[in-house]
Amino acid sequence: DLTLVVGRTGTGKSTLLGTLNGIVPHFSGGRLDGTVTVAGRDTRTHRPRELADVVGVVGQNPVAGFVTDTVEDEIAYGMEQLGISPSVMRKRVEETLDLMGIADLRRRALLSLSGGQQQRVAIAAVLAAQPRILVLDEPTSALDPTAAQDVLASITTLVHDVGLTVILAEHRLERVMHAADALWWLPGDGSVVQGRPEEVLARADVVPPLAALSRVMGWPTVPLSVREARRRVGPRPGLPRAPQPSEAMTWHGGGDEVLRVETLGVNYGQVCAVDALTTTVERGTITCLMGRNGSGKSSLMWAIQGATKSSGRVLVNHEGSWADPRKADAATARRMVSLVPQSASDLLYLPTVAEECAQADKESEVPAGTTRAILSRLRVELPEDRNPRDMSEGQRLALVLAVQLSSRPDVVLLDEPTRG
């Protein structure tokens, strides 16, 4: 079966998944009430290493689970720990590389991969060990839409054809809810509502498009696919047609250029990530950067921010004059361009939320409480004494966004800002 776990950020989805292989409470601390039994083994008395042959887990941050240097070695590592013979390992490595569409990455260094590529490698490393239960915490959060569909299709095939049990937490429900056999909803009060997806989604506080349509139409259950929704609606000759978009789109720019990029290039050895890009961005506008995993989106953002070595020029209209943030001092550069990276936790290093907020206020030279106020405007309430490492990926992302916005930068760069 494929079980889907849903709930808002911070409701305990990752904690619940952590109980399935003993990470909670053996490594997380806390008190576990009740029992979790996996293949006849009680997770309270069996540590994660004693469950590794039956439960495979891919967390929200794949890099945190890597232990080797290259893709091929990482996929083989888990099988080595389980004592699988070399001949079987070689066969499984090849099969998994093909299944996940990463055969061309086999000899690449893990740290040289994009976030989406790393996510696919992490899933491949777990699948190669052929666990009986696969636990995935937001497995498509860093994947482009095509890659996400490919990965979910592969997982669904394993469920239906091989009998693999998959428990999956996901925010983008429209991608996977049609394939789910059961759904667990975490309202945030510590309880878990279980049932059939179409029944639970009808009352859950997470509302994918089809659930929103269901509520408007007054349907008792939620259609799990567009095809099913169309069947329910049936012919409605009295309904007005949706307005058709005009051929000519009107550009609503701010009129004031804030960013100029001139022949910007980024190269890693013989690999060209960004090739002589020239563009401008106007103040008060939102620019969407799209591309497949590994196409250079993050490289471009880091180059604009100044952390990645690049050629060409980057100019920001800061306080009435044009300057290159790559050549400015740290404080000025932060007020010119701020970047929220894919791995938001990389920017968090203090032991509490309060200290992170206070440090951001100090570095941004703004009144005390500014960062905390921004966090509240993001509708994320975090206890001041909470350690960022104990928070969910989404909560850490919100905290980093508040920290970066505290300096009121001219340009804000967001790399996969909806993870978690």
Regions found by a protein language model. Name each.
Residues V121-I123, V151, L401:
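Hydrophobic anchor residue at the start of the ABC signature
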Residues A109-L113, Q117, N387-M391, Q395:
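Conserved ABC ATPase signature
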Residues S87-L105, V366-E384, G394, V400-A402:
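Conserved ABC ATPase "signature" region
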Residues L134-D137, L143, V412-D415:
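Catalytic Walker B motif of ABC-type/P-loop ATPase nucleotide-binding domains
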Residues L186-P223:
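Conserved beta-strand-loop-alpha-helix hinge in the C-terminal portion
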